[in-house]
Amino acid sequence: MENNISNVRIHLHRKCDVNEQDIYGKTALHYAYTKRNIDIIKILLKCPGIKICIKDNDDYTPVDLICSTISSYIASSLENKIDEVDKLGETPHYENG
């Protein structure tokens, strides 16, 4: 992983466009999220001019992806803790989509 961080730093030092999109519309931040590489995400977010709301070809921004993961994680965590039943005798649950 350290090699990936070094590569990112080298590209940024060479003044590469941190917001450049590939043929799929994805930026470095999209890919850092996909790889769940928190260290690279932190480095990219410190870059002047970073745009966190660039949409890829599927209309997802890095913010969309991160928020959906956080929401799913929180919902799943809550669901695992809930053992109370409501008036209908059901436990709350989270539905995707």
Curated annotation (Swiss-Prot):
Segments annotated as ANK repeats:
24-54
* InterPro entries named among the record's database cross-references: Ankyrin_rpt, Ankyrin_rpt-contain_sf
Which PROSITE patterns does this UniProt record tie to the protein?
Answer: ANK_REP_REGION (PS50297), ANK_REPEAT (PS50088)
Superkingdom of the source?
Answer: Bacteria
Alphabetically sorted, this entry's keywords are: ANK repeat
Please identify the protein, giving its name as recorded: Putative ankyrin repeat protein RBE_0357
Taxonomic lineage per UniProt?
A: Bacteria, Pseudomonadati, Pseudomonadota, Alphaproteobacteria, Rickettsiales
